[in-house]
Amino acid sequence: MIRSVLVLMCSLTFIGNLTRGQSVDMGHNGTGSCLDSQVQPDYFESVHTTWPMPIDTSKAEGVIYPNGKSYSNITLTYTGLYPKANDLGKQYLFSDGHSAPGRLNNLFVSNYSSQVESFDDGFVVRIGAAANKTGTTVISQSTFKPIKKIYPAFLLGHSVGNYTPSNRTGRYLNHTLVILPDGCGTILHAFYCVLHPRTQQNCAGETNFKSLSLWDTPASDCVSGSYNQEATLGAFKVYFDLINCTFRYNYTITEDENAEWFGITQDTQGVHLYSSRKENVFRNNMFHFATLPVYQKILYYTVIPRSIRSPFNDRKAWAAFYIYKLHPLTYLLNFDVEGYITKAVDCGYDDLAQLQCSYESFEVETGVYSVSSFEASPRGEFIEQATTQECDFTPMLTGTPPPIYNFKRLVFTNCNYNLTKLLSLFQVSEFSCHQVSPSSLATGCYSSLTVDYFAYSTDMSSYLQPGSAGAIVQFNYKQDFSNPTCRVLATVPQNLTTITKPSNYAYLTECYKTSAYGKNYLYNAPGAYTPCLSLASRGFSTKYQSHSDGELTTTGYIYPVTGNLQMAFIISVQYGTDTNSVCPMQALRNDTSIEDKLDVCVEYSLHGITGRGVFHNCTSVGLRNQRFVYDTFDNLVGYHSDNGNYYCVRPCVSVPVSVIYDKASNSHATLFGSVACSHVTTMMSQFSRMTKTNLLARTTPGPLQTTVGCAMGFINSSMVVDECQLPLGQSLCAIPPTTSSRVRRATSGASDVFQIATLNFTSPLTLAPINSTGFVVAVPTNFTFGVTQEFIETTIQKITVDCKQYVCNGFKKCEDLLKEYGQFCSKINQALHGANLRQDESIANLFSSIKTQNTQPLQAGLNGDFNLTMLQIPQVTTGERKYRSTIEDLLFNKVTIADPGYMQGYDECMQQGPQSARDLICAQYVAGYKVLPPLYDPYMEAAYTSSLLGSIAGASWTAGLSSFAAIPFAQSIFYRLNGVGITQQVLSENQKIIANKFNQALGAMQTGFTTTNLAFNKVQDAVNANAMALSKLAAELSNTFGAISSSISDILARLDTVEQEAQIDRLINGRLTSLNAFVAQQLVRTEAAARSAQLAQDKVNECVKSQSKRNGFCGTGTHIVSFAINAPNGLYFFHVGYQPTSHVNATAAYGLCNTENPQKCIAPIDGYFVLNQTTSTVADSDQQWYYTGSSFFHPEPITEANSKYVSMDVKFENLTNRLPPPLLSNSTDLDFKEELEEFFKNVSSQGPNFQEISKINTTLLNLNTELMVLSEVVKQLNESYIDLKELGNYTFYQKWPWYIWLGFIAGLVALALCVFFILCCTGCGTSCLGKLKCNRCCDSYDEYEVEKIHVH
């Protein structure tokens, strides 16, 4: 542990505090003329960049150690005066003078003495940084010598002018502080004198004066063991006479060549000096070693040039020194175990530094962090108020003031007042206020101003104070404290002759009403007149004189006015927002225009409405004569200015800033959340210095607009990644620069930047056989395809609330009070950051579970002509149908007609003989009627035509007997008409079936739209929950929590210091409570979203990747397949399944047991044992129990495949006879495996696409219009039940004519002859006429009968 830093350092020792006073002895004055100086700034600037030395905070350079405090082995943030990180400072160089062999010539300096710099908050100096190296001698830049350390000299003062008669700048007027090194760098002078220029040749008061220059001559002044302690001081005295010196201090310095730091600051205690010398240990920490009694504000400083008079052959190079301005900054400091500051971070330098300071850690792990600790600072003022006539205070200044019980009241509106002028006419003895400060009362705007005045002795001032219970407040005047009010007690001076002095002061001692029960005292209401005013107006001439009217009685007391008249003024104001406001007389000022302050944070005072905000031009809304436009939370959002323009007003809030940091490459980038890049530049006052610089200079790639906000330090890319270490949200990922993939900036190529990639999450579609479980008494008998839609919220919007900004809105007074609440804000930030990390973890787990390596689109995985749009109810038929072969289709003509169900039997009958003769024989019976198809082939046409013509032609020859030949024709007509009728009836029944099926589809569509409505409602609620929470949090900003106003600026403007703290503390306490409740709610919602993410993971794994056996888990009904798509804040599922449309109520049993001993029991597998009462009787008890699956009612015998032996259970059904053993059969419950086999074959699907989630902000998601459309669709579907009219089909084949058959047979014969000659005759001999027989090679094979196989 280090000792107190106030202990004087061994290497920098104070050796004298010479006599302080108005005439400190500074020794003899300078004599002779000044040395001539050659001023050549170009020589010094040419080596300006030789040794760039920026502030390196990692080495704690330029850090002033906290005064009076000591820390050990700790890291903390500290606000004080520090240099800015990476500040290059300003470089200064000294040089040897001109010389020739054997003589020393004029001095060689830069123009530093004419450069007057602003002192501001002070500065620090880096001294001897390049000592012991090799450098140029400046005067001869080609000559390089070892570099020696040299100390700077300074002039510091309040006022600066020009030297006369040379008219050169840089002369310090009045008292000037001089810091002067001497004794060849072994002593430091500090004195405070008036510098009077001497008029000798080349001196400051002479015409040829060029530059103030210090010098010493090492050959004579720096002789070993005998250093000249006043060589430089003597040179300074040659230029100035030192007059009226108030002090002179000397400090010795140990001679060395080590680099060191020196600093100067000033406060009300004086000028403070700091040095990094500490017990001969040289570090970058500077410790306070002296305070100089300089109380006049130092505004400027100048570096005094120095030139060393060295011989030509002994020139040296002198180390440059660097001056860095100090600023009020917050640093993160690391103290080692000894107490020294080993490293630091400038919290305002860049976003990474901001991140480190937010977490008070130098080591930050790779991640995405939300930080925002820099608020908008007002950069101007905007004031507008009514300019009308002056408020008339004449009635108060003329006539005789009334007594207290009959006070007079003046109410002012729509005028400008001047309370300062009014009160200056009186001798004020007391000015006390409530809810407003005296200064604010004189400078604020109000909707009305009320003044009550009366004659009143100041000796009785205590009786008017709050809490008094005397006769004054009971029966005369009671001040109203419900509004801001002030009480002024004053004496009327003799020269104010317009006011007439009364002879007596008077007040009431009682006021009461007489009744049978005695006196009923009547007390004054606040700000109201006494009920006995009518009696008191009669006046009082003696003490305790009473007046009564029979009902009321009052008593008065008088005492004479001695000396000057004394009066009381009660001033009350009311705050409002109307244009008839009362404002102070406006002084001439330049802050009445907003045009030059648009889009920046300003303090505003608009007709009594004060605050802080950003103004910008926008489209006018609201009523112009109302001036102000407010939102639902009573926040000012618009203003109609006196210049005719309308301005939108938004608060000076900080933009959510996220820092993306990669530890491996030590790179970082910045993301401005929920803000457009076009708006970022208007908010730059809130950002770190490097961020503002980059935004202006565009030195980094970007800004780049993304769905999550405006990104800096990124370049866009087409990369798609499966793993992401730095998720940005909305499926975006930050890819840090790496050794394998580096992206150089296009501008300089010297820095690595991040890339924005897209996360790729995919999931395969793997389906398993359907198998339902569970027990129900209503078993489905019919199904339809149905789609159930479901939304699951997996994440909520990440929120980072800048606690300090939310509570205090940038007001330092509030922030100082907020520090007394300890680490509350840091805990809030940590809690929100933890919630965000919890979300990242849950989403990462979800995505890691559902992603796959290789996927293919759904359409690419389907074989054949399968069409996804044709997913509908499978067609179920009750019979089998035979089809002709392809050859038959080629050999026969065919026609398609409506088939009532008899066409197949007719066709089979016709094949057994000549068709022309079998037509009537093959007539079919349907419902008792003979029917024939309504078609004739050419043979039947010829036969029936011949029969008809013959009967007609022969009728005249046979006396009508030949008409019997027309009977077949008539019967064929009758039968065919019957067929047409039967066909129409069957078609009508088919139409009913089709209509029923279509109406079932409509019902399924209605159900689908209903679930869509419900799912959309859940999406809307999930997205809007975040906005509602933020809106509620924002609404609390308008809550006063018992304070006089919700605006801190109003509180600061109205009240004095003590009341300000009390009122602001109420706001802090209330807002912290609201913020704590919000954070607690956010944590609960985060945990709920994490649990929902787990549910979504289960849904994807069980529903999307496979088939679920759980009833109702993956939609309604028997699950088939599910699809997942992206949705705001979650996943949207489409569950496809078989949904029952009708059920049968069956008597079921959990199991069956017999009465044998030991008893045997069986239980169903994935189904039930049911009583099939339609096919069984009570007597047939062996056959009345059947098995049916739970997903479809299909009673079947109990087999080993659908049952198993189990132990006895009380719920099992007992049979009185022997339990039949399960049949040895493979029959199982009816499932849909065969129907869906082709659908499930080679099916795969691309998983959820998480790349295009739209940005969700606090704007409420409104799906009401879409939901109304869906409701209207459902309504229209309810009206869509129609009767369909569509016919069935039957294909009828007709043989070709005889001549076609003749040609066909001739062709076959020719083909057979060719085959015979090729295969037989050519293979058995030399020719078909040879001696060898061909029967051996052409022998036929033995015939055998083929066993017939029947296929059912």
Curated annotation (Swiss-Prot):
Location(s) in or outside the cell: Virion membrane; Host endoplasmic reticulum-Golgi intermediate compartment membrane; Host cell membrane
Pfam short name (any one): CoV_S2
GO cellular component: host cell endoplasmic reticulum-Golgi intermediate compartment membrane; host cell plasma membrane; membrane; viral envelope; virion membrane
Glycosylation sites per record: 29, 73, 111, 132, 167, 174, 244, 250, 418, 495, 590, 617, 716, 760, 771, 782, 867, 1145, 1172, 1214, 1226, 1242, 1257, 1278, 1289
Spans traversing the lipid bilayer: 1298-1318
Site (Cleavage): 745-746, 884-885
PTM characteristics: Specific enzymatic cleavages in vivo yield mature proteins. The precursor is processed into S1 and S2 by host cell furin or another cellular protease to yield the mature S1 and S2 proteins. Additionally, a second cleavage leads to the release of a fusion peptide after viral attachment to host cell receptor. The cytoplasmic Cys-rich domain is palmitoylated. Spike glycoprotein is digested within host endosomes.
InterPro entries assigned: bCoV_S1_N (IPR032500), BETA_CORONA_SPIKE (IPR042578), CoV_S1_C (IPR043607), S2_sf_CoV (IPR043473), Spike_N_sf (IPR043002), Spike_S1_N_MERS-CoV-like (IPR044337), Spike_S1_RBD_bCoV (IPR018548), Spike_S1_RBD_HKU5-like (IPR044364)
Family annotation (Gene3D superfamilies): 1.20.5.300, 2.20.210.30, 3.30.70.1840, Spike glycoprotein, N-terminal domain (2.60.120.960)
Keyword Hydrolase on entry: no
Residues in the Cytoplasmic compartment per record: 1319-1352
Region listing for Fusion peptide 1, in residue ranges: 885-906
Domain notes: Fusion peptide 1 (FP1) and fusion peptide 2 (FP2) function cooperatively and have a membrane-ordering effect on lipid headgroups and shallow hydrophobic regions of target bilayers. They are considered as two domains of an extended, bipartite FP. The membrane-ordering activity is calcium-dependent and also dependent on correct folding, which is maintained by an internal disulfide bond in FP2.
Organism: Bat coronavirus HKU5 (BtCoV)
Domain BetaCoV S1-CTD: 389-585
Organism lineage string: Viruses, Riboviria, Orthornavirae, Pisuviricota, Pisoniviricetes
Signal peptide: 1-12
Residue intervals annotated with topology Extracellular: 13-1297
Bilayer topology term: Single-pass type I membrane protein
Region Heptad repeat 1: start-end pairs: 991-1041
UniProt GO BP: endocytosis involved in viral entry into host cell; fusion of virus membrane with host endosome membrane; fusion of virus membrane with host plasma membrane; receptor-mediated virion attachment to host cell
Stretches assigned to coiled coil: 1020-1064, 1259-1287
Chain intervals for the UniProt region annotation (Heptad repeat 2): 1247-1286
Protein name: Spike glycoprotein
Self-association and partners: Homotrimer; each monomer consists of a S1 and a S2 subunit. The resulting peplomers protrude from the virus surface as spikes.
Gene behind the chain: S
Family in the record: Belongs to the betacoronaviruses spike protein family.
